[in-house]
UniProtKB/Swiss-Prot annotation:
Protein name from the UniProt record: mgtA leader peptide
Keywords: Leader peptide
Task performed by this protein: Makes mgtA transcription sensitive to intracellular proline levels. Under low levels of proline this protein cannot be fully translated, and a stem loop forms which permits transcription of the downstream mgtA gene.
Listed InterPro entries: MGTL (IPR031434)
Pfam families the UniProt entry points to: MGTL
Entry annotated with the keyword Phosphoprotein: no
One of the GO biological process terms: transcriptional attenuation by ribosome
Family the UniProt entry places it in: Belongs to the MgtL family.
Amino acid sequence: MEPDPTPLPRRRLKLFR
């Protein structure tokens, strides 16, 4: 997935992946 413009926490990144 492409990196979002807003810095998301690692927990959010894990959920996104």
